[in-house]
Design a protein with these regions (language model features):
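Active-site loop/lid in soluble adenylation, ligation, and acyl-transfer enzymes
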Residues: 1-51, 135
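Short active-site-adjacent helix-start/loop capping segments
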Residues: 43-46, 51-55, 75-80
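Short, His- and charge-rich active-site/binding loops that engage polyanionic ligands
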Residues: 49-69
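A glycine-rich, hydrophobic loop/mini-helix early in the fold
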Residues: 62-84
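Catalytic beta-strand/loop module used to bind and position nucleotide/cofactor moieties
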Residues: 81, 85-150
Length: 150
């Protein structure tokens, strides 16, 4: 079982989310990857969201903010250079959301920041949300991706 890590050097939201989806579609069932990336200014919307209802598209165009749709549900989020994004992608036999969340929590705690899991998908530090997470499955491959305010 190969465990892989990939850090994108691109800050293009379209490229990074396309890579995220490509990894989901092309990973072998016996593999697991942690993919990390940072996007320059972008609004990332969930798969079922209407961009005309969620975004001020004129202001986004004027401010050169990308609009990117992700493959998971959930609400719109703003990405910029202060936001680290991660994606755990694994065959269903290796996929363990609790273990993946604990990996993130333990890493944040190693930085001296007390944090906890809350609700369905959120991570909190001192009662404030610093990470939202979403999930999907295609065939025998599962994905858990999220954001971290840095």
């Amino acid at each position: 079982m190969p465990n892989l890590f990939y850090l994108s050097h691109s800050t293009d939201g379209w490229q990074n989310l396309a890579t995220d989806e490509w990894l989901l579609d092309n990973l072998a069932p016996d593999e697991m990857i942690l993919y990390c990336y940072i996007n320059r200014n972008a609004v990332i919307i969930g798969k079922n969201q209407n961009p005309w209802k969620e975004c001020n598209l004129g202001a986004m165009e004027a401010d050169e903010v990308q609009l990117v749709r992700r493959i998971t549900g959930g609400g719109a989020v703003y990405h910029d250079m202060g936001n680290l994004n991660f994606s755990f992608i694994a065959g269903e036999d290796l996929y363990d959301v609790e273990k993946q969340m604990n990996t993130i929590l333990q890493t944040i705690r190693m930085l001296g920041i007390p944090c906890e899991f809350s609700g369905r998908n959120d991570l909190l530090a001192e009662g404030r949300k610093f990470s939202g997470n979403a999930f999907c499955k295609r065939g025998k491959i599962c994905q858990h991706h999220g954001t971290l305010l840095i």
